[in-house]
UniProtKB/Swiss-Prot annotation:
Belongs to the NAD-dependent DNA ligase family. LigA subfamily. Its EC number is 6.5.1.2. The lineage of its organism: Bacteria, Pseudomonadati, Pseudomonadota, Gammaproteobacteria, Lysobacterales. DNA ligase that catalyzes the formation of phosphodiester linkages between 5'-phosphoryl and 3'-hydroxyl groups in double-stranded DNA using NAD as a coenzyme and as the energy source for the reaction. It is essential for DNA replication and repair of damaged DNA. It comes from Xanthomonas oryzae pv. oryzae (strain KACC10331 / KXO85). This is DNA ligase.
């Protein structure tokens, strides 16, 4: 495999992961859906052609996506997967051909076809025919409980019709805002001087995320059902439609209608690729006249048995496809091209545009992706460009209208210095991305590092928003992430006041007002004496806020009854809570390049100890399944940096505690062999076969170091391989790495238990269900602790449930458990059990 292929796959993963982070975690996307889909498809094609490129943490193996913190999180009983996308007829025909070959049927394939609604995916749960819960899609595995807001949507049935209603039924569908409702809402909002909704899609999503359901009730929302999740008929749970209910997708939709769910009247059943493409054409022509927004059509194999036979890939069903419409476009003028710096230093060019309406939204910025894209398009300041909101969401510059270019424009060049910190902007050979070389000395990178560190899937510091992170970094109060754990309530209050003041003069006047209004009236004359009353005209530097703080401005002990402090106290409490974490969260929070959640989880499971991981030579990381050379080298590079080790030391010194440390997995024992180490060192020409041959003949790295190629040749190793290995070992850095890796390999073998000694948890093989609200810990935290003891935590009660943990306001699950004779635990018993087995924190 060519090095260029490896590098391209690495670049694609980096760009996709960055796009996922900005879209789901930061809510600040920088590339369009169309560009994302293009990158994703290219990566899939590379991984299909070169399977050895596939890793467990590849973006192709997971569903993107993030859950907001305002609502209770709920894990879906069956994941809400996304769909593969098609953008042309060839991809649609290939989709049909794949199913045809797999099914081996001589009859034309039938497909259920429907519009791709542009709203918010939702899962509705019914128990004994009554609505009990509505959960957003979230990241596909975990969503937000928006039940009270769902209840306000009139098209959602609260009680199902008919006599054959399942005991448990999960219905998947889309909440959307009709176009006429959107228009009427904005008319009323404009008349009242209120903020307008940007588009129906944003209106639907924002309405469901209102904490006050009375606000949601005022929004014109509607719902279409298009599928099902979990079904329980009598005592049997199904993760697919049972034959007794329906044998085809279209029949299942008809049954949903009979139960009272709204199903689009545009759903049809067609045959073959010709039928699919004809439907796509018809819906595309009718699109502008529809009462709701759509961004494509969806094709699903109608036969449910065929769906089961086709199965799933990790990200999507093989039996369904989303055929998307072309993005909407408008022309405007480029007023400037600026650089944004991301967490890893990536320098992304952004076009500042003359405001233009595209698909119902005013667009002022558009991504240019990278310097190569700018060069390809030859975008210049002053150009008229075509702006596309790919997927009808994120704007990008799609093309330049060359014949409208004004005279004397100049080609754009990537700046040589970072606009934030002044460090050199560099690009590694073969890379498309330019990066600021300042690393964490660059405030922009520090800000992104902080945002990642406190995010929900990392250290989960609730309440620390993006704007306040900017204040913390700009002020110099925090230099590294460990400084978060030194913050005080007084510092936060001081920062908030300085950050919200329009000028130092306004700040000082506010200070005087606070002092004069409390028990400090005697200081008023002093303030007047030093010129506070006269402040107002003198020019001050833009850095005045940070300068005041760096100068050691004393904390103001103002009348706390007149200053809101609860937010600061809550934030400090959230920071304190985050001190107790898990190894996988801690590793993910460090922001190591290429180390996503799944890789962090694998490292935790296989090695179990931070001190071991942070001092491990990079080749040994490759013994973990699905960690390849690129990720292993990235880990090694990160831990080789003294600054990163120092940052970890600071976090531990400030009492960040990792509570799930354990010995290395015994499964590693069979992997820690000299042959594997020789292979993992990536020595040119040393293939797995040659590595095994050399390991058998020599037994250790030391035996290879000083003999040159001759002993290798005598042992039957080909001359070219022997010379390559001997030459590689002559490089001091390589020799040091090999010796260090050999020693660590031996140490690992000595510290791990034998396979038979592997500990089992007290709840191994048992299924547990949690219901209601727990006072001492969240349900997610309880779930993690129970899983650490071997339990499988399920979402519904059955005869196989070992026990049910019932918190406050436990509902139908408690009733079901009692009727089945399942053991009931209250929170006190749970906490006692966790404490007994070392899971109290």
């Amino acid at each position: 495999m060519e090095q260029g292929v490896i590098e391209r796959a690495r670049e694609l993963r980096r760009r996709i992961e960055n796009a996922d982070h900005r879209y789901y975690d930061l809510a600040d996307p920088e590339i369009t859906d169309a560009q994302y889909d293009q990158l994703f498809r290219e990566l899939q094609e590379l991984e299909q052609k070169y399977p050895e490129l596939v890793t467990a943490d590849s973006p192709s193996m997971r569903v993107g996506g993030a859950v907001r913190k305002s609502f209770v999180k709920v894990r879906h009983s069956i994941p809400m997967l996304s769909l593969a996308n098609a953008f042309d007829e060839v991809e649609v025909k290939n989709f049909v051909d794949r199913i045809f070959r797999r099914m081996g049927s001589s009859n034309p394939l039938e497909f259920s076809v429907e519009p791709k609604f542009d709203g918010l995916a939702i899962s509705l749960r019914y128990e004994l025919g009554k609505f009990v819960q509505g959960v957003t899609r979230g990241d596909g595995d975990v969503g937000e409980d928006v039940s009270e807001n769902i209840r306000t949507i009139r098209s959602v049935p609260l009680k199902l019709k008919g006599n054959n209603v399942p005991a448990i039924l999960e219905v998947r569908g889309e909440v959307y805002m009709p176009r006429d409702g959107f228009s009427e809402f904005n008319k009323r909002a404009m008349a009242r001087g209120e903020k307008l909704l940007a588009n129906p899609r944003n209106g639907a999503a924002g309405s469901l995320r209102q904490l006050d359901s009375r606000i949601s009730a005022q929004r014109p929302l509607s719902f279409f059902a298009y599928g099902v999740g979990l079904i329980q008929v009598e005592q049997d749970l199904f993760e697919e439609i049972p034959q007794s209910i329906a044998s085809t997708h279209s029949a299942m939709l008809a049954q949903l209608r009979a139960w009272g769910f709204p199903v689009s009247s545009l759903v049809e059943v067609v045959q073959g690729s010709d039928g699919l493409l004809a439907y796509y054409q018809r819906i595309g022509e009718a699109r502008d006249g529809l009462p709701f927004d759509i961004d494509g059509v969806v094709y699903k194999l109608d036969d449910l048995a065929g769906q089961r036979e086709m199965g799933f890939v990790s990200r999507a069903p093989r039996w369904a496809l989303a055929h998307k419409f072309p993005a909407q476009e408008q022309s405007t003028t480029v007023e400037a091209i600026e650089i944004q710096i991301g967490r890893t230093g990536a320098a992304t060019p952004v076009a500042r545009l003359k405001p233009v309406h595209v698909a119902g939204v005013i667009v002022t910025n558009a991504t240019l992706h990278n310097a190569d894209q700018i060069a390809r398009l030859d975008v210049r300041v002053g150009d008229t460009v075509i702006v596309r909101r790919a997927g009808d969401v994120i704007p990008e510059v799609a093309a330049v209208v060359a014949d409208q270019r004004p005279p004397a424009t100049q080609s754009w060049q990537m700046p040589t210095q970072c606009p934030v910190c002044g460090s050199e902007i560099v690009r590694e050979e073969g890379q498309a991305v330019w990066r600021c070389s300042g690393e964490l000395t660059c405030p922009a990178q520090r800000k992104e590092a902080f945002r990642h560190f406190v995010s929900r899937r990392a250290m989960d510091v609730d309440g620390l928003g993006e704007k306040f992170i900017e204040v913390l970094v700009d002020s110099g109060v925090v230099q590294g992430v460990a400084d978060l754990y030194l913050l005080t309530v007084d510092q936060l209050l001081q920062l908030r006041m300085i950050s919200t003041a329009e000028s130092p003069h306004a700040f000082l006047r506010e200070a005087r007002e606070h002092l004069a209004s409390g028990a400090y009236a005697q200081l008023e004359a002093t303030l007047v004496g030093i010129g506070v009353d006269l402040a107002g005209e003198r020019e001050v530097p833009q850095t005045w806020q940070a300068d005041l703080l760096r100068a050691g401005l004393p904390t103001f002990d103002w009348n706390r009854k007149k200053i809101a402090t609860k937010w600061a106290e809550n934030l400090i409490e959230a920071i304190e809570t985050s001190r107790d974490t898990t190894l996988e969260r801690f590793l993910f929070a460090l922001g190591i390049e290429h180390v996503g959640e799944s890789t962090a989880k694998a490292l935790s499971a296989w090695f179990g100890d931070l001190d071991l991981i942070r001092h491990l030579p990079w080749p040994l990381f490759k013994r973990v399944p699905d960690i390849g050379g690129e990720v292993a080298r990235s880990l090694g590079h990160f831990f080789d940096q003294p600054g990163n080790q120092k940052a970890i030391d600071h976090l531990l010194a400030r009492k960040v505690r990792i509570g799930d440390t354990h010995p290395p997995s015994p499964k590693l024992r069979g992997e820690l062999r000299l042959a594997n180490l020789l292979e993992d060192l990536e020595i040119p020409k040393v293939t797995p076969i040659r590595a095994a041959q050399i390991a058998t003949a020599f037994g250790s790295i030391d035996a290879l170091r000083n003999g040159g190629p001759e002993p290798l040749v005598e042992a039957g190793v080909p001359q070219s391989v022997a010379e390559s290995l001997a030459t590689w070992l002559l490089v001091p850095a390589n020799d040091t790495l090999a010796v260090k890796a050999q020693k660590k390999l031996s140490a690992l073998l000595a510290m791990m238990p034998e396979a038979g000694e592997e500990k089992t948890g007290p709840l191994d093989g048992q299924t547990v269900v949690i219901t209601g609200t727990l006072a001492a810990l969240t349900r997610d935290a309880a779930k993690q602790r129970l899983e650490a003891l071997g339990a499988k935590v399920a979402g519904s009660v059955s005869k196989k449930t070992a026990f049910l943990v019932a918190g406050e306001e436990a509902g139908s699950k408690l009733d079901k458990a009692q009727s089945l004779g399942v053991e009931i635990w209250d929170e006190a018993r749970l906490l006692a059990f966790l404490g007994e087995h070392g899971q109290q924190r």
